């Protein structure tokens, strides 16, 4: 096999630990609602419970479509769908305010795994190009703010969010987009992720090696076989070194 030259990481569940509890998701939408009604109190908005429910349904529909079609969408598109479900006509400034409220709610949303920064530093010293590929509807600047807070941004050569692309993982085009930006061939890349279908099958499909980071949250499909499996990111440098020397 070709010696690895670049490593591409998933974000949530791989580099960072992120809360996805229902109460946390509802809290974010309520923050969005409060920002909206605080700035535009006389616009005749529905009550907060209805807003949270409609936006949550729009978010669930987004992810369902991602799973079925490998589609992608933007933050503005998702909130617009939520307002449609509410039967509300929304102006551009109102939409922007609702988005800003959500963005404030997710500031500091995730915590890097304890070995994330150390592993990235080791891989950079070893000469690997490093990339990030995340399935998300969130705006790039929302994610980038958190990466900067934890000083992970300075260790990544390329960062790609599917909210900026027409497709989501496991669609081949998003993996090839990252390899193009890294200026390496897919066969020279290693994808590291915690989701078997999105990360592992997608990477294998374009000729990459694929390292599955164990995650008991998701059901593991038995028909997908990763190139290697790890429990902690700290296992990566040794694994990659073995591949380089083989």
Summary of predicted features, one role per range:
Residues 1-7, 18, 43-46, 117, ...:
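Asp-based, Mg2+/Mn2+-dependent phosphohydrolase catalytic module
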Residues 2-126, 140:
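N-terminal helical cap/lid subdomain that shapes the substrate entry/recognition surface
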């Amino acid at each position: 096999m070709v010696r690895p030259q670049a490593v591409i990481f998933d974000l949530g569940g791989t580099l960072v630990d992120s809360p996805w509890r229902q109460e946390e998701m509802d809290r974010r939408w309520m923050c969005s609602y409060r920002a909206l009604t605080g700035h535009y109190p006389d616009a005749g908005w529905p009550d907060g419970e209805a807003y949270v429910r409609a936006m949550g349904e729009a978010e669930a529909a987004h992810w369902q479509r991602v799973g079925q079609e490998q589609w992608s969408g933007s933050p503005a598109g998702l909130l617009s769908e939520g307002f449609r479900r509410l039967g509300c006509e929304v102006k551009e400034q109102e939409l922007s305010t609702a988005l800003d409220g959500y963005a404030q709610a997710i500031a500091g949303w995730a915590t890097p795994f304890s070995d994330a920064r150390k592993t990235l530093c080791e891989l950079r010293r070893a000469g690997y190009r490093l990339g990030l590929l995340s399935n998300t509807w969130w705006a790039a600047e929302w994610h980038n703010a958190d990466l900067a807070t934890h000083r992970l941004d300075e260790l990544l050569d390329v960062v790609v969010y599917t909210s900026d692309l027409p497709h989501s993982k496991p669609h081949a085009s998003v993996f090839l987009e990252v390899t193009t930006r890294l200026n390496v061939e897919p066969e020279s890349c290693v994808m590291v992720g915690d989701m078997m279908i999105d990360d592992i099958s997608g990477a294998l499909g374009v000729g990459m090696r694929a390292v599955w980071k164990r995650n008991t949250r998701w059901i593991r499909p038995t028909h997908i076989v990763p190139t290697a499996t790890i429990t902690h990111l700290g296992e990566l440098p040794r694994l990659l070194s073995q591949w380089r020397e083989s």
